Amino acid sequence: MNKPVLVVMAAGMGSRYGGMKQIDPVGPNGQVIVDYSLYDARRAGFETVIFVIKHEIEETFKAAIGDRVSKAMNVKYAFQQLEELPAGYTVPEGRVKPWGTCHAVLAAKDLIDGPFAVINADDYYGPEAFRVMYDYLSTHEDGSYYDYCMVSYLLRNTVSENGSVARGVCVTNPDGTLHSVTERTRIEPYADGVHYTEDGGASWTDLPGDTLVSMNLWGFGKSFLDEAENRFAAWLDANLPTNPLKCEYFLPLVVTELIEEGKAKIQVLRSTDKWYGVTYRQDKPLVVEAIARKTAEGQYPENLWA
């Protein structure tokens, strides 16, 4: 069994943030959020990282992150390009948005030779998540079904005071495996707790603060790549006619199909760490403050890659 590798999705556009938030410094020596994720991942056992980026930001990204991290990890690059579609499909006129998280992972398909974890470049996950993820991937292989996992967080630890966030709301089975994950694209805190809307704010539904949510920290076997690739054309057929410019091929979509078909079980691992991220530019001071505090407490050295 090959050692688990880490896939970092860093090709997103940062539309709500307004800029390349993947490389916006938050640490005392110019570190960005993913520096801390990679430091935690390296301590947990991950030795190889595959960055999924766009060709246009390659040089900037390498200078800001990749070259620095390469002192401590084996760094590889994959490129998520709009034109990477199944035979017979073309990019709709006017489309600039990437095809989503599942498409990002498929961009790295040729570089993945065993189990792998997936993270967002612009989310701070905390050390616990990488420990439980690496341990699981190192000790589980596909058997009569695909044996995957995800790390869940408590909803109250993952909201932004500065606006809405999108989260995958998880329902678990009695044995701790994932029953379903539903993408809620507009979740907001309010005076009495946390709620979400699906109709532009006309009506709201409360969610308990201890609801388990996905932050796109998934653990898969290589089998997932074939499943995702084989389902892509059917997904395009179903979505391009109605939403050609904005539809996205999300990881939870394929996960849900595999669960419903009885092909996969997804163990729900848990982290009680608080999430930090920069969905909005106003979130940045909170992240800077949190990193400074964790550095002062000794959780991280001032220079991560010295």
Regions found by a protein language model. Give the residues of each.
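N-terminal glycine-rich phosphate-binding loop and ensuing alpha1 helix
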Residues: 2-66, 75, 80, 114
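Hydrophobic packing residues within well-ordered alpha-helices of enzyme cores
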Residues: 61-65, 133, 287
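Short phosphate-binding loop-to-helix
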Residues: 69-114
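Short, surface-exposed amphipathic charged segments that create phosphate/polyanion-binding patches used
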Residues: 87-98, 163-168, 282-286
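Short beta-strand-to-loop acidic/aromatic patch adjacent to the donor-nucleotide binding site
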Residues: 114-124
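Hydrophobic/aromatic residue at the end of a short beta strand that borders the catalytic acidic motif
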Residues: 125-126, 220
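Conserved core of the sugar-phosphate nucleotidyltransferase
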Residues: 127-215
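Conserved alpha/beta core of the MobA/IspD/sugar-nucleotide pyrophosphorylase nucleotidyltransferase superfamily
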Residues: 172-174, 181-306
